[in-house]
Amino acid sequence: MTRVAVIGAGITGLSSAFFIKKNYPEVDVTIYEATNRPGGKIKTEKRDGYVIELGPESYLGRKKIMTDVAREIGMNEDDIVTNQTGQSYIYAQNQLYPIPGGSILGVPTDIKPFISTKLITLKGKIRALKDLTMKPISITEDDISVGHFFRARLGDELLEKLIEPLLSGIYGTDIDQLSLMSTFPYFKSLEEEHGSIIKGMKQVRRERQKNENNNRVGAQGQFKQFKQGLYDFILKLEAWLKAREVTIEYQTTVKDLSSTQQGYNLIFENDNTIFYDGVIVATPHQVFQKWFENDPMFDYFKSLNASSVATIAMAYDNANIENYENGTGFVVSRTSQTDITACTWTSKKWPHTTPKGKTLIRAYIGKPGQRIVEDCTEEELVQIAQRDLSKVMKFQGSPDFTIVNKMIQASPQYHVGHISKIKEIQAHIYDNYQHLQITGAPFEAVGLPDCILQAQNAVEKLIPRIR
């Protein structure tokens, strides 16, 4: 019998085991997890009728692989919810500005609301519209920073006031260092195909509207979640795996890997050794890079920085809080003097998460290059969030409760050149480590469906070679 070890029980590791048992049910699978729980960054807390996400909030619905897996592990349509649509805002120049209608990731596709917005000056609007007549931007070494690309296409002002707040929060990276081809390569493809980012995104918008019309569905949110929280997905996935005789060993740390001609010996903290025909590594890069110190190809991961972020959830009685605006949340421009980077009015965006008569807010703290998350206590982070939020909202009294979740060095920073280096490393692994695959956020996109897709790809690269 072929035996495979999966190291790491986050969503990538669990999904790796899922695809092994789905497509190769005869393979014996054991998952090793250093902590006492599955799910990695996914954490949901239920309290007093609230469903509170402390890690990732949701996933992009058009990336259907996560919804497909949810159905396969026994979740039904009633378990899956879509976010409420509503106005989103940019906090800039000490006030909230509505994100102009028709904007997609900050790129204008409807000229009228873009021209009428007060967020961008007339000079900034004229500069952005030059995109319509510019030639494609040439790039060297097959990559360019997101900041460089959008500055060249749309100008500094639109980038800094609209695009940067929306994009940098996803990856926690300085936009002038963030790799375009590792994160948003389709922007470059649209530019080359249509000669303009604005024209390209207008076509994307038309296609989305056409699909909505064909499906006879009105305006819907882009994001999905689960009624009982994202962690419900993790627990059901864990149960599905256990029902198929997958063993999950918690609080078990793999200290090292030792290769043989037939596979790998896993060496544990107590120096016990267990042999496996194949191994899938789905841990943070800070963990696995030390196992390959003798291979210079893995030196890249020593210099791969990761950013920290804290989420601060605050629950209030409706009588004790006043939103100035009726919307789902806001992101903060880089020029604003705040420590929070974004805020979600969760009770409006996800009504199922909050009891009637209550308001749930989630603030985010953590900017590239800062150490505020590492250096501040949880109480200090709550005070910082309340200080910054008081600039746009009125609070009376204290919240019913607050919950802080620190995610230290949790988001790998994809700097320019990342994707070409990762492709080189992946080819090296395939050519030189027949019994091994390494996957997860250090390699490619960090969204939950992307992690599941990477797991599927890792399984299909590994299992046929070792059976």
Each predicted region: which residue ranges?
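Dinucleotide-binding Rossmann-like beta1-alpha1 core, especially the glycine-rich loop
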Residues: D48-I137
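Mid-domain catalytic core of redox enzymes
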Residues: T253-I361, P368-E374, K391-V392
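Conserved Rossmann-like nucleotide-cofactor binding loop
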Residues: T12, R37, Q286
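Short loop/edge segments at beta-strand edges and connector loops
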Residues: N83-Q84, Y250-T252, S258, G440
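Conserved flavin/dinucleotide-binding core of flavoenzymes
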Residues: G101, N326, W345-R467
